[in-house]
From Swiss-Prot:
Signal peptide: none annotated. Keywords: Mitochondrion, Transit peptide. Pfam families: Neugrin. Residues 77-88 have a biased composition (Polar residues). Residues 89-101, 139-148 have a biased composition (Basic and acidic residues). The keyword Transferase does not apply. Residues 1-68 form a transit peptide. Belongs to the RRG9 family. Required for respiratory activity and maintenance and expression of the mitochondrial genome. One of its GO terms (cellular component) is mitochondrion. This is Required for respiratory growth protein 9, mitochondrial. It is found in: Mitochondrion.
Length: 273
């Protein structure tokens, strides 16, 4: 018979039975995943897995379903385990609130490093800068608003703008024969050849047509003869200019009134004298 001291305790009997019968407890998935040893695929020797150093957080460990089931199955101290889990959950939930409260209270509790003297100096320098900037802007605006000294050509341009607000539009000078034709047409049919119609036809202002019809001046015979001579000379001079370019043929009777003859003839007469 066995001695009473060598008899196994009633708590060790279930463990011995399990070892003899080969029964294995169902470990949770977290224990399998983060176990300290992992079986090698080639041999039966166990080697440390690289995932063994990845420690579980308290929340993940406590919320795993297998662990909760295992804890519910154990009859020893069920009230203490549930109370500890609830306390851990409450502590984790209160942590972010404490952090947020600390972060919100920090800026309020911080004391400004600037003393009363430094604050006064800062405000004084700021006001001085503001006044200096305003003074600089005012001086620039005064310089821009001040009248600049105009050059002669600018003064002349302003005077021409005042004299001719619509721009340079010189009066059109009509030929004396055209003036006679305007008078003749208006005398024949005043209703048809009105002042606006004649102004549009000859491209002059109605005021100019009105003055032409109003005037009664007629040139004398001497003025008419002088005018014809002047027109003939002009005609010959223009003909000679076009002949030199090659547009018109040369004419010997117009050679005396050419520009070259007039220029060199005046020089020869001056040298002979």
């Amino acid at each position: 018979m066995l001695k009473p001291s060598s008899l196994p305790s009633p708590l060790a009997v279930p463990g011995l039975l399990r070892s003899f019968l080969g029964v294995r407890l169902a470990l949770p998935a977290t224990y399998r995943k983060y176990s300290l040893t992992a079986p090698c695929p080639t041999c039966s020797v166990t080697r440390p897995s690289p995932k063994c150093w990845q420690s579980l957080s308290r929340r993940q460990f406590s919320k795993s379903p297998t662990i909760l089931l295992h804890l519910s199955d154990t009859p020893e101290k069920p009230q203490n385990s549930s109370s500890t889990l609830e306390q851990s959950h409450q502590q984790e939930e209160l942590k972010p609130d404490r952090d947020s409260n600390d972060s919100s209270s920090k800026p309020a509790e911080m004391v400004s490093p600037m003393g009363p003297k430094s604050k006064a100096e800062f405000t004084g320098s700021r006001s001085a800068r503001a006044t200096g900037g305003k003074a600089g802007r005012a001086s620039k605006s005064d310089k821009l608003d001040a009248p600049q000294k105009l050059e002669p050509w600018q003064i002349q341009k302003q005077a021409l703008k005042k004299k001719f607000p619509e721009g340079w539009n010189p009066r059109k000078r009509l030929h004396p024969d055209t003036l006679d034709v305007i008078r003749h047409l208006h005398q024949q049919d005043p209703k048809k050849y009105t002042t606006p119609f004649l102004a549009q036809e000859y491209k002059v202002s109605p005021e100019a047509i009105r003055r032409i019809l109003k005037s009664k001046w007629q040139p004398s015979e001497e003025v008419i003869a002088e005018r014809r001579e002047r027109w003939e000379r002009r005609h010959k001079r223009i003909w000679n200019q076009l002949a030199e370019i090659g547009v018109r043929p040369q004419r010997s009777k117009f050679a005396d009134l050419s520009d070259t003859r007039i220029l060199y003839g005046s020089r020869r007469t001056a040298s002979s004298k």
